[in-house]
Amino acid sequence: MEIERKLLRLLHGHNTRTRLPEIHAHLLRHFLHGSNLLLAHFISICGSLSNSDYANRVFSHIQNPNVLVFNAMIKCYSLVGPPLESLSFFSSMKSRGIWADEYTYAPLLKSCSSLSDLRFGKCVHGELIRTGFHRLGKIRIGVVELYTSGGRMGDAQKVFDEMSERNVVVWNLMIRGFCDSGDVERGLHLFKQMSERSIVSWNSMISSLSKCGRDREALELFCEMIDQGFDPDEATVVTVLPISASLGVLDTGKWIHSTAESSGLFKDFITVGNALVDFYCKSGDLEAATAIFRKMQRRNVVSWNTLISGSAVNGKGEFGIDLFDAMIEEGKVAPNEATFLGVLACCSYTGQVERGEELFGLMMERFKLEARTEHYGAMVDLMSRSGRITEAFKFLKNMPVNANAAMWGSLLSACRSHGDVKLAEVAAMELVKIEPGNSGNYVLLSNLYAEEGRWQDVEKVRTLMKKNRLRKSTGQSTICDVSV
């Protein structure tokens, strides 16, 4: 018994991750490989350390695993994945004639919630009803999570209504479920019914309102949360800062900044620092964004990307390019596809075509990143803005991806600025082909012909618009122009 207690203490010690093989060896040396209790603990620790391979190897040598061991394996795969393995162990347990208990079903339901196919979950729910475990509160919470994660809010509501006691966890699941399925009003109604709310409840509701374009209501809810004495956490900060920037409510954003500094959130979470950099970039204060960036003790690729892109948006492309160079020179963080989109935008705003071409090649050759449609679009925009419209056109025609409306729009705008009517006509006609239902493109083409006095062509465009039952409407094209 003493050796078992010692091994249990070792399993729950501070250095367990590095000592798993040593602890396992102790277990074998003292002939405890038949102790299902110890083995279940060992497998549970493997799961908490995301080491499912080791757990599986240990399980494969157990001659007579009991429900404790199977529960540990089911929980291990519910934590680490793949979730289908949990169901496999559940099936194996049943085939051996081992009865499941209440500790079997909670992780099993969690695994079912992770699967996109609800059929498995419904089978488990049926099993729960047959065995009577569905009456247990924590099991019902798992069933609610199963249905909310699968968007089956009717089924979730039925289980929720049957619960005599509902804790904050199940309320949060229902609110998030309704909001994620598009019924924000229902989610808000439930939120207002809650007698006790957690910070998770507030964050879920604020985020859901913002996602459906109701930023003003989201901010009002945040203010109500503060008035009720809740302190913002990481998720609150990351959610509310973009809302503050979108609404132009700088005082709120600065208050959140101050709170994040004093509470330690800024120090503890890279995401908070990134959100602050983004907030100040979107608010037009690149100096404050840079100060936050430099103050961050740890930075990831998002940190660099946010400030590089923010430099372009704020008309400081040169600074953004220098920042990119510093990132590469430092070498701690590798750039990704978004990094190059940001720095190419910086090149575009500063007219540095050659540097942009160099970076475009660097992305694929040195960093082995695949150029996406957005990167080709950035190159077209770079050449077009710099007046190198013939190069831009050749690039468009020879690139391996299909040109989209934004690319042809960039070229068209540049052609009109530089008086290249012939190429402008080609670009406008391509826009009409890509977006035949966008009346703004027809108006652009018609105006081009009108400026050249080609009235027969103007009439052809108008006839085509009538044929396609299109009317002139403002704001449909990304290119500004006078109407026909």
From Swiss-Prot:
Region (Type E motif): 407-482
One of the record's GO molecular function terms: RNA binding
Xref: PROSITE patterns: PPR
Keywords, comma-separated and alphabetical: Repeat
GO biological process: RNA modification
PPR repeat residue numbers: 66-100, 101-135, 136-166, 167-197, 198-232, 233-267, 269-299, 300-334, 336-366, 372-406
Keyword Repeat: yes
A Pfam cross-reference name: PPR_1
Gene3D superfamilies assigned: Tetratricopeptide repeat domain (1.25.40.10)
NCBIfam families: PPR
Family, per entry: Belongs to the PPR family. PCMP-E subfamily.
Designated name of the protein: Pentatricopeptide repeat-containing protein At1g09190
